[in-house]
UniProtKB/Swiss-Prot annotation:
InterPro entries: Ac/propionate_kinase, Aliphatic_acid_kin_short-chain, Aliphatic_acid_kinase_CS, ATPase_NBD. GO terms for molecular function: acetate kinase activity; ATP binding; magnesium ion binding. This is Acetate kinase. Its EC number is 2.7.2.1. NCBIfam families: ackA. Its cofactor is Mg(2+); Mn(2+). It comes from Clostridioides difficile (strain 630) (Peptoclostridium difficile). The keyword Magnesium applies. The gene is ackA. ATP binds at K14, H209, L210, G211, N212, G213, D284, F285, R286, G332, V333, G334, E335, N336.
Length: 398
């Protein structure tokens, strides 16, 4: 069975075609600047070094997906001879609120439910829905599945997801912790159990998805019991441009002092904060590490604050689960930041985390980075959200 995995952003689209007989990626691609001048598709077929590139106007996601399907079935660069070889489409959907705790086959009722969640993810859900509609128009007979970033976290107990706010704000507007990166946390926790040869039901795992956006999850027996992101992807860790946890009273203070309105605050917290705002240098951790090595004190303090926040969450989740067996690092910083992983592991030996410095000297490769006698196993696992989406799609349409 061949499954097309789509991840639609507001002006971009990532895709992979995966042969589920052997979980082999047949082709991958990216469309950028949808609805903007300079639209471009970049497509790669497995086993080829050259790329197939198309630069032409794409007014909307329907135009973009039509070009994607042409590329997938291209006579030279395609991975199938004709579109009807695509057996199913798996869509990444950012926010399902409380409506879906697992992936679902997309029906008109599911689409209506997703539209009701637009207020919870105004930047992401409209693009996800546009991708679904475009696919239905071009591939009307192909089954489609929605895989939700929030679904994995729906197993959290109320004690983890309720905020200290008036209860009617939860009942009226759904104000609660939802969590994000769920597909990634799900994949790496399952993969960690496989690598260690353990039953995931017997493991207490903390998964650290450390990218430009970053979140941590407590996974007890294969189920998420807590996560650092909240009502939106802004809560939790210090991120590339997002502030993470701050005192909420800072916001009305800044509204008065800086004359900011709600949109101004939103921009400040989401686009101008995090390590970018703290250093004034970049949202790229490599740039900040270089500056820190060259004696930049703000860069040094920023990295220390970032590491300390990750350590706090690991410790808190170990306490919440009454134990800790595994810590997993994934995503851009987690997979490639050797020094940051080492700093996070430092001062954590009291929890049973002992880093193997030689094993940690690796980037982007599945590796056990803890010592043989470490009570808590630490692993580097590159995330694979596309494969997880394809697996869920296969399970539901088979």
């Amino acid at each position: 069975m061949k499954i097309l995995v789509l991840n639609c952003g507001s002006s971009s689209l990532k895709y992979q075609l995966i042969d589920m007989n052997n979980e082999e990626v047949l082709c991958i691609g990216l469309v950028e600047r949808i609805g903007i001048e300079g639209s471009i598709l970049k497509h790669e077929k497995a086993g080829r070094d050259d790329k197939y590139v198309v630069e032409q106007p794409m007014k909307d996601h329907k135009d973009a997906i039509a070009l994607v399907l042409e590329a997938v079935a291209h006579p030279e660069f395609g991975a199938v001879k004709e579109m009807k070889e695509i057996d199913a489409v798996g869509h990444r959907v950012v926010h399902a609120g409380e409506k879906f705790a697992t992936s679902v086959v997309i029906t008109p009722e599911v689409e209506e439910a997703l539209k009701e969640c637009i207020d919870l993810a105004p930047l992401h859900n409209p693009a996800n829905i546009m991708g679904i509609d475009a696919c239905k128009a071009i591939l009307p007979d192909v089954p489609m599945v929605g895989v939700f970033d929030t679904a994995f976290h729906q197993t959290m107990p109320k004690s983890s997801y309720l905020y200290g706010l008036p209860h009617e704000l939860y009942t009226k507007y759904g104000v609660r912790r939802y969590g994000f990166h769920g597909t990634s946390h799900n994949y790496v926790s399952q993969r960690a159990a496989e690598i260690l040869g353990k039953d995931i039901k017997d493991l207490k795992i903390v998964t650290c998805h450390l990218g430009n956006g970053a979140s941590i999850a407590a996974v007890d027996g294969g189920k998420c019991v807590d996560t650092s992101m909240g009502f939106t992807p802004l809560e939790g860790l210090i991120m590339g441009t997002r502030c993470g946890d701050i005192d909420p009273a800072i916001l009305p203070f800044l509204m008065r002092k800086e004359g900011l309105d709600a949109d101004g605050l939103d921009k400040l917290m989401n686009k101008e904060s995090g390590v970018y705002g703290m250093t004034g240098i970049s949202s790229d951790f490599r740039d900040i590490e270089d500056a820190a090595k060259n004696g930049d004190e703000r860069a040094q303090a920023t990295l220390e604050a970032y590491v300390k926040k990750v350590q706090k969450y690991i410790g808190a989740y170990a306490a919440e689960m009454n134990g800790l067996d595994v810590v997993v690092f994934t995503a851009g910083v987690g997979e490639n930041g050797k020094a940051i992983r080492a700093d996070i592991a430092s001062n954590m030996e009291f929890l049973g985390m002992k880093l193997d410095k030689e094993a940690n000297d690796v980037r982007g490769k599945e590796t056990v980075i803890s010592t043989a006698d470490s009570k808590v196993k630490m692993l580097l696992i590159p995330t694979n959200e596309e494969l997880m989406i394809a697996r869920d799609t296969l399970r539901l349409v088979k």
